[in-house]
């Protein structure tokens, strides 16, 4: 169309969880203007938590301002990831990264909803999140909320092609820096 606005919507992020009655799934809505996200909303249904942000504003959770974690120590950081559904040619590198983070971070979680993972980074529940094999509808809203909450978001090369590039690293500054270093090395970026 001639519009400079584009909606990126995932009506149910975490579909497999929903089907199997695992209570982690969310609705993710982003609005892009001139190829830039200007509004992001992630609603985690079972917790009745609405994470949102807008350009020039703040990142919020149910009406209260949120920020990424201030944890400076990567060894004390709680990370999140998702498991790839395709592109298994990169699986060895993914498992090497997973192993490294298991040995050097406080723990790794897999919720099954990238939008919820990103929302949790934005409010400080997780220090970082990484995954590949993603779609724009999985990450556009959540990544924007992380950025507006003071976090860093890039692709595996440290560049800004994370919405349409199928791979993403998000976190507070110390966690993002360490994850980017390890991931770019293991994935030969």
Map each language-model feature to its residues.
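N-terminal subdomain of lithium-sensitive/metallo-dependent phosphomonoesterases centered on the IMPase/IPPase/PAP
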Residues: 1-12, 152, 160, 174-189
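Alpha-to-beta junction loops
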Residues: 123-128, 151-152
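Acidic beta-strand-loop-alpha-helix segment within the catalytic core
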Residues: 29-118, 165-189
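Short beta-strand and adjacent tight-turn residues that come in two discontinuous sequence segments
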Residues: 131
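Flexible, acidic active-site loops/lids enriched in D/E/S/T/G that coordinate Mg2+ and/or position polar
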Residues: 1-33, 41
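Conserved G/P- and acidic residue-centered "switch" motifs that form tight phosphate/ATP-binding loops
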Residues: 15, 44, 146
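A short, glycine/Asx- and small/polar-enriched loop/turn
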Residues: 1-5, 74, 122-125, 163-165
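Hydrophobic residues within well-ordered alpha-helices
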Residues: 119-122, 143-148
